[in-house]
Regions:
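Beta-strand-enriched accessory nucleic-acid recognition/scaffold domains that flank the catalytic cores
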Residues: 1, 10-11, 49, 54, ...
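N-terminal positioning helix adjacent to the helix-turn-helix/winged-helix DNA-binding module
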Residues: 1-4, 44
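Short basic helix-loop element that most often maps to the first helix and adjoining turn
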Residues: 3-22
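DNA major-groove recognition helix of helix-turn-helix/homeodomain DNA-binding modules
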Residues: 24, 41-61
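Recognition helix of helix-turn-helix/homeodomain-like DNA-binding domains
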Residues: 24-40
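ADP-ribosyltransferase catalytic core
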Residues: 67-73, 78-80, 96-107, 113-175
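Short polar catalytic/cofactor-binding loops
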Residues: 86-93
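Active-site-proximal loop/hinge segments that shape catalytic or ion-binding/gating pockets
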Residues: 149-214
C-alpha cells in the first residue's frame, strides 16, 4: 500500500504536504502511509480516489503497472510460467483446492494469465490479497480445453447443468475429462456464456446456436 500511495502522489505531481492538505490530514499521516507505518482508512482512500479521478490519474493502470514490474523482475527457469491469483482474505498455509465445487472446472485453485481478471474478483474486499505465482509445469499432467463445444459441455458439467442426464455416457465423458489432471487450462465463462449454456440445456437454442456463441 505504501508504494502505491507514493506512486499515486507522484502521478498527481504533489508533495506530501500538498496531498495532506487535499485529503485534510496531517503531513505526518501521509508520511506514515508512505513509510508503511499506517494504512489510510476508508474515508481517506475514497478521497484519494476522487482526487485521482479529478486529475485523470488511473489507479487501476498504476496497479497493473506495479504488477507488470514485479512480474518482469522474476526470473523463470525452463518449464515455469507466471500466473496470477486473487484471494478475498489471503492465503494461509499451503495452496489447496478450496474453491466451490461448482466453478467452471470444478473445485480447485484458480489462477490466470491476465492480472486484471484476478484484480476484478477481489477489488471490493478489504482483506483481499493479490499473488504472482511461479508454477513449474514440467512434471505435471495437464489438459487444455479450447473454447469450443467441448469446453461448453465441460463447464456445464461442473456448473451442475448436466444432472438431468446423470449416468449417461455423455455425463460420464465430462465427469472423467479432468480426472487425474494436475492443471486444467482453459477460458473462464462469463455471465453471457452462462446464460447461453442455460438456454441450451432447457431447449431454447440448438447446439449450432451454442457453438455460434462461443
Amino acid at each position: 500500500m505504501q508504494a502505491l500511495i507514493k506512486q499515486i502522489r507522484e502521478h498527481l505531481d504533489m508533495s506530501q504536504t500538498e496531498l495532506a492538505e487535499r485529503l485534510n490530514v496531517s503531513f505526518a499521516t501521509v508520511n506514515r502511509w508512505e513509510n508503511g507505518r499506517a494504512v489510510p482508512n476508508k474515508l481517506a482512500q475514497t478521497k484519494l480516489y476522487e482526487i485521482c479521478k479529478e486529475n485523470a490519474v488511473s489507479v487501476y493502470d498504476i496497479i497493473l503497472e506495479k504488477i507488470a514490474n514485479a512480474a518482469d523482475s522474476i526470473l523463470l527457469s525452463k518449464g515455469r510460467v507466471l500466473l496470477y491469483h486473487g484471494s478475498k482474505s489471503g492465503i494461509e498455509g499451503k495452496i489447496e483446492p478450496k474453491s466451490r465445487s461448482q466453478c467452471d472446472f470444478g473445485k480447485g485453485f484458480y489462477m490466470g494469465t491476465d492480472p486484471s481478471q484476478a484484480l476484478t474478483l477481489i477489488c471490493d474486499y478489504d482483506k483481499s490479497k493479490f499473488y504472482i505465482v511461479s508454477v513449474d509445469t514440467a512434471d505435471l499432467n495437464l489438459i487444455e480445453v479450447p473454447a469450443d463445444i467441448e469446453w461448453a459441455m465441460f463447464v456445464a458439467y461442473h456448473r451442475g447443468r448436466m444432472e438431468i442426464i446423470k449416468g449417461t455416457s455423455l455425463y460420464e465423458k465430462y465427469r472423467k475429462m479432468s480426472e487425474n489432471k494436475d492443471i486444467v487450462i482453459g477460458s473462464i465463462a462469463n455471465d453471457r456464456m452462462f446464460y447461453v449454456i442455460d438456454n441450451f440445456f432447457i431447449g431454447n437454442i440448438t447446439d449450432a446456436a451454442l457453438v455460434g456463441c462461443l
